Design a protein with these regions (language model features):
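N-terminal Rossmann-like dinucleotide/flavin-binding domain of flavoprotein oxidoreductases
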Residues: 32, 37-40, 248-307
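Thiol-based oxidoreductase modules, predominantly thioredoxin-like and allied folds used
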Residues: 50-58, 147-159
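Beta1-alpha1 glycine-rich phosphate/pyrophosphate-binding loop at the start
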Residues: 122-126, 164, 208-278
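Short hydrophobic core segments
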Residues: 216, 308-319
């Protein structure tokens, strides 16, 4: 059950909804989780007149997110509690064009260029801290590319299927029955794997962008270099697969001076928030494929065809642990 404080927060979140959304529920009358699923979704739906539930008897347990009566392509075969409650909320908000987790224009173009149809399934646990990032990234791809569908499946209530698919860890992602990923991931990494599996429509060439400083890697050191450069009035871009870098893999951090205790995920969020305070282009979900020097400029090429150049590049990547490379 949701307490009054959470309900008030949900009412505030959903107050901005423009379209109407339906949780289209299909569940067996005798399913042990039927009451929990129906009660939880009805409770969420009660927080906005833009949300409703429709219940139908069926085999198993699932619900599909509908927008104005049409299938969005997002399905949950789970009771979205625990860490996946946020995934449910983000699915609704993102379907309405809301949220701060939308990828930038170039990543969006790459997602839209994926050749479908693509059917994705993510096996998860409601206690898994790595699962929501994967679920939310794939749901975002569904909303941006109508050729993609995604099911989020709770292994604890689909044990026979988990055993049949030989799932050993969560999250595990299957693409049309083929396992393509296991464990923590980012949107950029998942996108690369889908591009390799399905191919993409060729994108138009993108003009090389020029900066004063390019920072490769967005851990604490890379973020620091970008912020210090921006404070000097320089035009700066930071390029990384994900903000925070390896920090995201750390559960507890207690050796960051002036901060007695934090988590890797929280520190990564704080780094991104701090970077956003300055005129820094944050180029996330990108893997640098090539670095070269041309006419006195450092040129960085990333997966997907983008190129960037600057007279100065600073590298704080994890290819060689804790190594800093400064090119002047």
């Amino acid at each position: 059950m949701l307490d009054s404080a959470i309900k008030d927060q949900l009412k505030g979140l959903f107050a901005q909804l423009e379209a109407h959304y339906t949780f289209d529920i299909f569940v067996h009358p005798q399913h042990e989780s039927r009451a929990e699923l129906v009660d939880s979704l009805e409770e969420v739906a009660s927080c906005s007149d833009k949300l409703s539930c429709r219940l139908q008897d069926s085999e198993g347990l699932k619900f599909i997110l509908l927008k104005e009566g049409k299938d969005t392509g997002i399905t949950f075969r789970a009771v979205p509690g625990g860490h996946e409650f946020t995934s449910l909320l983000m699915a609704v908000l993102n379907a309405d064009g809301k949220g701060k987790n939308f990828p930038d224009e170039f990543i969006t173009r790459r997602i839209k260029a994926l050749q479908g149809p693509i059917s994705l399934t993510t096996y998860l646990s409601l206690t898994c801290t790595n699962c929501p990032d994967v679920v939310q990234a794939l749901n975002m791809m569904v909303l941006l590319n109508g050729q993609i569908r995604h099911e989020a499946v709770d292994g604890s209530i689909n044990e026979e299927e988990v055993e049949r698919m030989k799932v050993q860890a969560v999250p595990t992602v299957f693409a049309d029955g083929e396992q393509i990923h296991v464990g923590r991931s980012s949107m950029g990494d998942l996108l690369e794997k889908l591009e390799a599996r399905y191919g993409s429509v060729e994108l138009e060439a993108v003009e090389t962008k020029e900066y004063d400083v390019l920072v490769a890697g967005a851990g604490p050191a890379g973020a620091t270099a970008a912020i210090y450069s921006a404070r000097k009035g320089l035009k700066v871009a930071i390029i990384a697969e994900r903000i925070g870098g390896q920090v995201n893999e750390t559960m507890g951090i207690e050796n960051l001076i002036s901060v007695p205790q934090t988590t890797g995920k929280q520190l990564a969020q704080d780094l991104k928030k701090h970077l956003a305070e300055y005129h820094i282009d944050i180029l996330e979900n990108r893997r640098i494929e090539k670095v070269e020097v041309a006419e006195g400029m450092k040129v960085l090429s990333v997966k997907g065809g983008e190129t960037y150049k600057a007279p100065v590049s600073v590298s704080y990547t994890h290819l060689r642990a804790h190594e800093t490379v400064l090119d002047l």
